[in-house]
A protein has these predicted regions:
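Flexible inter-repeat linkers and adjacent short helices
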Residues: 1-11, 18-23
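Amphipathic alpha-helical scaffolding segments comprising HEAT/armadillo-like alpha-solenoid repeats
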Residues: 1-7, 27-44, 65-78, 98-112, ...
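Short coil/turn segments at helix-helix junctions and helix-capping linkers
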Residues: 10, 185-189
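Structural detector for internal amphipathic alpha-helices that build alpha-solenoid repeat scaffolds
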Residues: 14-29, 50-65, 83-99, 117-133, ...
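Short, flexible, glycine-rich and Lys/Arg-enriched loop motifs at helix boundaries
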Residues: 42-49, 77-87
Length: 206
């Protein structure tokens, strides 16, 4: 543990990033404060440290470091449209604020205001964590994001990817039309996941 603490406290962003990646695979709740402090320091660096901030945010979400909630909420409120840090914060915010894997209240709260990146991250949490919202919440989410990200330019990933993956474990009658709609868009990764979700099969996500 001392080695990880030293890396988190290092002045080198590469060291901090190494520690954050380690903590995504080796949970250490006792390092919550140090991870948050590391994120705050990295936020004061220039924009080149965005990769490290993303890894720290991923670490926060996976370890369920709830003390970081205000930091994540701040990023979500800024709601930057095309920003990887914001996407990571969206996923982590779902994780630290939910009571269990049926709780999508944070997503519902931001459904009508979230931009591309925030929405991308929040919807990813549904699929990567195989969340199980109520049928009512499923209907609400699908109706709200039916065409979410439709007009994004080339080179951007489809933000509904995580949602499409989550549909594999949901009531088929609630998701069938949505999945067929996603297949029809022609996006190759989404089409692959949607076809498997129609069969009730979870796939390995990117």
């Amino acid at each position: 543990m001392n080695d990880i603490i030293s890396l988190l406290q290092s002045k080198k962003t590469t060291d901090v990033r190494k520690a954050a990646k380690f903590l995504q695979k080796n949970l250490m709740p006792e390092l919550e404060d140090l991870v948050i402090e590391a994120f705050q320091r990295e936020s004061l660096r220039n924009q080149k440290s965005w990769e490290t901030r993303c890894e720290l945010i991923n670490c926060i979400g996976i370890n369920d470091y709830k003390k970081a909630t205000p930091l994540l909420e701040h990023i979500a409120e800024i709601n930057e449209e095309f920003d990887t840090v914001t996407s990571c914060a969206g996923k982590a915010l779902i994780r630290v604020k939910r009571k269990d894997k049926s709780d999508v209240s944070e997503l519902l709260k931001r459904l009508n205001t979230m931009g591309y990146s925030l929405g991308y991250g929040m919807l990813d949490a549904l699929g990567y964590d195989k969340m199980q919202p109520s049928n009512e919440d499923i209907r609400t989410i699908i109706d709200a994001v039916w065409d979410f990200g439709k007009n994004i330019g080339k080179g951007f990933c489809a933000p509904r990817y995580g949602l499409v993956a989550a549909c594999a474990g949901w009531e088929p009658s609630l998701v069938r039309d949505f999945l067929l709609h996603c297949i029809a868009t022609g996006d190759v990764p989404v089409k692959y996941v949607a076809e498997n979700s129609l069969k009730g099969k979870y796939v390995r996500l990117r």
